[in-house]
Structures are given as structure tokens and as C-alpha cells.
Design a protein with these regions (language model features):
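Acidic/histidine-rich catalytic cores and adjacent linkers
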Residues: 63-69, 73, 113-212
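Alpha-helix boundary/capping residues
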Residues: 58, 103, 206-207
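RNase H-like nuclease fold core
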Residues: 1-82, 167, 171-174
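Glycine-rich, often proline-containing surface loops adjacent to acidic residues and nearby aromatics
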Residues: 36, 92-93, 200
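Conserved beta-strand -> loop -> alpha-helix junction used to position metal-binding or nucleic-acid-contacting
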Residues: 18, 67-116
Length: 212
């Protein structure tokens, strides 16, 4: 789809990527930390194939900052296997809020929400170690809640504290994969907010103006 950008020949240390929906289309964008647009990819929805089509046009960076959209990790393994991943910490907190709500009612939920908020206070390796300890302490205190199951009236069985379990597993998996604190070793940004608040907002404004 036109217009298109020329080939990217420079290898960048950090690249921010995100997807934005415009009507029935999805636009995937890759930019540098100074918001230089490197490439974009139109698609019907976020998928491994769509992300791979974007990544294959750009030399693999040292770090990619992303929000973990559908298909992106498989595409990264395929096209940029050696690139380090930094999950956008803003989106991590938003995902936790969706699972736990703004005001969790249980002690377990409240404590896990506090651990999520503490991500923004991790500035050193020592801070990261202490944060990981908080996560382990939470598991020792409340981990059994994530395993409890309930049989419902229709005969189906599900996790009793499903939202709590999802919030816990989000932090657990990101911690295991070392996707939370990449910035401590590589000096990259922690979020894709510059991309969302800059270029993406500009696109939304233009689309609203022309009625797209």
C-alpha cells in the first residue's frame, strides 16, 4: 500500500513498535527513540505474519520496546531472534488494572496491585532484585488462591480467583522471560508512550479531521 518508505540500512540500538487501529485497518509502526519513523505495515489485524512483514524490512536492533500485541513475540523470534525485549511498563500496569480493577477488594489483589505500581520505582539492579523478592513473598502468602477452582451451577469448573490468577501470571511470565527490566542493562526507554502520545495521537487527530 502506498505511500511507502525506503529501505532501512542503519542498525538502531532501540526501536519502539506499536499497532493502531484506523477504521477496519490496523497500522503497525516502528520508530526510533527520537520518533524517526522507520517502517510501517498495514494489516487487517495484529498477527505474526503482519509483524514479521514489518520486522523483516529493518535491521535487528539491540532492544525492541513493545506492548506484547498478538503475534509479536513469534515474529520477533523469527525475524529478530537476538533482540532483547522490553515490555512497555505502562501497558503492564494497564493490564494489571484491567485484571484487578482500580480498587481490588481482596488483600491479595491489593498487594499485587502495589507490586505492579512499584515497577515504576525500579531504577537500579538492586531495586529489581528487591522487586523480584516482593513477587516471591506475594506468592508465598497468596499463591494458593491462584490454584483454587470452583464448580459452577452449569457443571463447568473454573478458577475461583480468575482475575487474580491472570494478573499474577502476567507478572510471573514477564519476570521469567526477563522482559521487565531490560532498560537496566541497555539504557533503553521503559515504555512506548513517546510513540503513542506523539505519532499515534497525530494519526488519530488527522483521521478524526478527515472523518476516517
Amino acid at each position: 500500500m502506498e505511500p511507502s518508505l525506503g529501505p532501512v540500512t542503519t542498525t538502531h540500538h532501540t526501536i519502539l513498535v506499536d499497532g493502531i487501529y484506523i477504521g477496519s485497518w490496523c497500522l503497525l509502526i516502528a520508530v526510533t527513540e527520537t520518533l524517526q519513523v522507520l517502517a510501517w505495515q498495514w494489516c487487517a489485524r495484529e498477527s505474526t505474519a503482519a509483524w514479521a512483514a514489518l520486522f523483516e524490512r529493518i535491521p535487528a536492533p539491540t532492544v525492541v520496546v513493545c506492548d506484547g500485541g498478538a503475534g509479536i513475540h513469534a515474529a520477533l523470534r523469527q525475524e529478530w531472534p537476538r533482540t532483547q525485549i522490553q515490555r512497555c511498563l505502562f501497558h503492564v500496569r494497564m493490564n494489571l488494572r484491567r485484571h484487578l480493577t482500580l480498587r481490588p477488594r481482596t488483600y491479595a489483589g491489593k498487594h499485587l496491585a502495589q507490586i505492579g505500581k512499584a515497577l515504576s520505582e525500579v531504577d537500579t539492579v538492586e531495586d529489581a532484585i528487591e522487586w523480584k523478592k516482593l513477587l516471591e513473598v506475594w506468592w508465598q502468602a497468596y499463591g494458593q488462591l491462584t490454584k483454587e477452582r470452583t464448580r459452577y451451577r452449569d457443571g463447568t469448573i473454573g478458577f475461583t480467583h480468575d482475575r487474580l490468577r491472570k494478573a499474577w501470571r502476567l507478572l510471573l511470565e514477564l519476570n521469567r522471560k526477563d522482559h521487565l527490566f531490560t532498560y537496566l542493562a541497555h539504557g533503553n526507554g521503559r515504555t512506548i508512550s513517546p510513540l503513542e502520545g506523539g505519532i499515534n495521537n497525530g494519526i488519530r487527530t488527522v483521521c478524526a479531521t478527515i472523518g476516517a
